[in-house]
Amino acid sequence: MNPLRRKRLLIILAVLGGVGLALTLALSALKENINLFYTPSQIANGQAPLGTRIRAGGMVEKGSLQRSTDSLDVRFVVTDFNKSVTIAYRGILPDLFREGQGIVALGKLDAQGVVVADEVLAKHDEKYMPPEVSKALRESGQATPAPASMPARQADR
């Protein structure tokens, strides 16, 4: 092989190696930032990965909110009306957080089936429901619950 061809081959191999390395790093970074949404039924059925950051959403069960008296620890149960999952959170809950309303919790699932959340998102107003929660409730056979101040037929629009 003459020196010119050898030099071109080395340059092409170096460029391909650099592109491959950059692509690997980019895909690795994207994989770390993907938070897949899981319903309480999917989590209870073992479809959600342990130790991986996920988004869990549903309706907060009435009477399930437990606050610690000496810390910011909070536990509550989220349901899709088929199955339920416990959410453990340390921090201040959003002002709009209420029992009986839809939330999305971001965190990791532990071996006991509890989602240890580092972020809790509450719906914005009485008509809003996170799209994932609304879809999950429809798929589970439950209509999107109507707020107390709205007639049921208006809530499904």
From Swiss-Prot:
UniProt GO molecular function: heme binding; metal ion binding
Keyword Metal-binding: yes
Pfam families in alphabetical order: CcmE (PF03100)
Intervals, Cytoplasmic compartment: 1-8
Subcellular location: Cell inner membrane
Keyword Nucleotidyltransferase: no
Annotated binding of heme, by residue: 124, 128
Listed SUPFAM superfamilies: Heme chaperone CcmE (SSF82093)
Domain of life: Bacteria
Keyword vocabulary terms for this entry: Cell inner membrane, Cell membrane, Cytochrome c-type biogenesis, Heme, Iron, Membrane, Metal-binding, Signal-anchor, Transmembrane, Transmembrane helix
GO cellular component terms, semicolon-separated: plasma membrane
Annotated PANTHER family: CYTOCHROME C-TYPE BIOGENESIS PROTEIN CCME HOMOLOG, MITOCHONDRIAL
HAMAP family: CcmE (MF_01959)
Function as written in the Swiss-Prot or TrEMBL entry: Heme chaperone required for the biogenesis of c-type cytochromes. Transiently binds heme delivered by CcmC and transfers the heme to apo-cytochromes in a process facilitated by CcmF and CcmH.
Family, as annotated: Belongs to the CcmE/CycJ family.
The protein, known as: Cytochrome c-type biogenesis protein CcmE
Gene: ccmE
